[in-house]
Amino acid sequence: KQVTQFNEGILPWAIQNPVALVFDEYDAGRPDVMFVIQRVLEADGNFTLLDKNKVIKQNKFFRLFATSNTVGLGDTTGLYHGTQQINQGQMDRWNIVTTLNYLSLDKEMEIILSKNKNLNNQKSKEKVANMIKVASLTRKGFMAGDISTVMSPRTVLHWVENTEIFKDTGYAFRVTFLNKCDEIEKNTIAEYYQRCFGEELPESLLNIQI
């Protein structure tokens, strides 16, 4: 004998339990779909299951979090294609909004070394520190409007891993990040590299013959 049984989804289940539910990439959700959490965002918001004629009361320890690359206004930079503009009525219901900026050099170094134990020596630490400094310059350059591509901590980690593969820091930088950049910005980014490592890349103006 076969029996069809209804099981509640992740949201109804989480609401009834002492759970911290995180919506990752929240701004990638379609606004008409995200309306389902509108009532949940109220201080004592309950969740209604219309197909079961059931109202679910929130557990007093239930918490809802969300992460996004935008602040609900849509993609104003062109870097996060696929994100949506979030309904402002829903944005108004989030009682705390905070910004997570890039990590400090020491924290970023700690993460990279934790994933690459063999680099835990003085020489390797100096090299990784210079890599993070290059990334920091791209972030400042992006904020200043000088370049349109930025190095994330993930990119730095890939650069470190590729350096281990190719045994060449400059080449690894080019295939990890520089080749993704706009052609007219490559000289600026090559300059960032030169400032930190004291070496010229082929993309540097000094190596371009007119």
Predicted features along the sequence, with ranges:
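C-terminal regulatory/interaction module of P-loop NTP-utilizing enzymes
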Residues: 1-210
